[in-house]
Swiss-Prot record:
Assigned keywords, A-Z: Acyltransferase, Amino-acid biosynthesis, Cytoplasm, Methionine biosynthesis, Transferase
Site residues (Important for acyl-CoA specificity), renumbered to this chain: 324
Coiled coil feature spans: none
Major place of residence: cytoplasm
Localization of this protein: Cytoplasm
EC primary class: transferase
Binding site for substrate: 227, 356
Organism: Marinomonas sp. (strain MWYL1)
Reported function: Transfers a succinyl group from succinyl-CoA to L-homoserine, forming succinyl-L-homoserine.
Molecular functions per Gene Ontology: homoserine O-acetyltransferase activity; homoserine O-succinyltransferase activity
Chain ranges of the AB hydrolase-1 domain: 51-359
Lineage of the species this protein comes from: Bacteria, Pseudomonadati, Pseudomonadota, Gammaproteobacteria, Oceanospirillales
Protein name stated in the entry: Homoserine O-succinyltransferase
Length: 385
């Protein structure tokens, strides 16, 4: 917790709730008759409502992207290193919006919410949601806030997929798209990782087919194992080696199945901590949304054809040691955009952190992001004049 709020922090922020009572048709064929989205804003919306930036979160992210909820907070929002006065996403220039997506477990309508038609928690009956559904709901939030066009939409990993979908679905509603450490669709290996994660949850005897709250239970073992698996894929081999190597907790082998290597202790801690803040049904939903995303399926697998609908400029960023969403996956998008005749910039950043590098304030990464968004801000100033 900070003794004093840093000068480059957005400070103490209060989440807001947007209630929607117009039904939202979902890709799965079901609909939500009503729902709510929790969100935070940083900075000030200008008179023409032209300086807004939307932040789209990754699998385990939420609406709390920057600042603090209270002075007692142990840490700031998940992307505080990038959002704030004078930072890469400069709140002196932009009005920044971050939300928790539908199906989430941090305040937006999801499996832990009450189904208004039954008066009971949704739990396993909450419908499958997709990236397309999220973007539709985000557009409704923009309407509510009086924002017709975003200056930029920014997202990393699964968040980057949402940005890509925005450029296709609502091409006139964003001027710039920033897609970081993402992909045009999941690889077979990534789908496999997600299935192992889901099976670890489903096979936990405390899962109760997704209705664990009604059974006064939580599938902590399964969810913790899913997080441990995911965490390994978010880090590079070099990063794990540098952090832990073969460090042990004892002077010699114990010849049992307890914790011996420091990396084992770390993974167990990460898994256990995750179960205290995240919902297993939400984790299942988020991984399915990842699996289903494939915009090129609309155009017989031709990514450049579907991206021809986009009208914004693009910035793509990848990281050299990211093997979950490798640089080659970003380059697929870049090449498709070039083929479609779109304006695109691309930066491959040297980084040791693996996929999680998109969350770190790596100097060249922050410079690339800041330079691109400064150009966006300057263009806004010129247009206002």
């Amino acid at each position: 917790m900070p003794d004093v709020i840093p000068a480059d922090s957005v400070g103490i922020v209060t989440p807001q709730i947007a209630q929607f009572d117009t039904p939202l048709a979902l890709s799965c064929g079901q609909s939500l008759s009503s729902y709510q989205l929790i969100y935070e804003t940083y900075g000030t919306l200008n008179q023409s409502a032209s300086n807004a930036i939307l932040i789209c979160h990754a699998l385990s992210g939420d609406h709390h992207a920057a600042g603090y909820h209270a002075m007692s907070d142990s840490k700031p929002g998940w992307w505080d290193t990038a959002i704030g006065p004078g930072k890469a996403i400069d709140t002196n220039k932009f009005f920044v919006i971050a939300l928790n997506n539908l199906g989430g477990c941090c305040g937006s309508t999801g499996p832990t919410s009450i189904n208004p038609e039954t008066g009971q928690r949704w739990e396993a009956s909450f419908p499958i949601v997709t990236v397309e559904d999220w973007v539709e709901s985000q557009a409704r939030l923009a309407d509510l806030l009086g924002i017709q066009t975003f200056a930029a939409i920014v997202g990393g990993s699964l968040g980057g997929m949402q940005v890509l979908e925005w450029s296709i679905r609502f091409p006139t509603r964003l001027q710039s798209a920033v897609i970081v450490a993402s992909a045009p669709k999941l690889s077979t290996q990534n789908i496999a990782f997600n299935e192992v994660a889901r099976q670890s949850i489903r096979r936990d005897p405390d899962f109760f087919d997704g209705n664990y709250i009604d059974n006064n239970s939580v599938p902590t073992n399964g969810l913790g194992l899913a997080r441990m698996l995911g965490h390994i894929t978010y880090l590079s081999d070099d990063a794990m080696g540098a952090k832990f190597g073969r460090q042990m907790r004892h002077d010699s082998y114990q010849y049992n199945y307890g914790i011996e290597f420091e990396v084992e202790s770390y993974l167990r801690y990460q898994g256990e901590a995750f179960t205290k803040r995240f919902d297993a049904n939400t984790y299942m939903l988020m991984t399915k949304a990842l699996d289903y995303f494939d915009p090129a399926s609309q155009t017989n697998g031709d990514l450049s054809a579907v991206l021809s609908r986009a009208q914004c400029e693009f910035l793509l960023v990848s990281f050299t040691t990211d093997w979950r969403f490798s640089p080659e996956r970003s380059e697929e998008i870049v090449n498709a955009l070039v083929k479609a005749g779109k304006s695109v910039s691309y930066a491959k950043i040297e980084a040791t952190e693996g996929h999680d590098a998109f969350l770190f304030p790596i100097p060249r990464y922050m410079t690339v992001l800041n330079t691109f968004l400064t150009r966006v801000a300057n263009r806004l100033t010129t247009e206002i004049k």
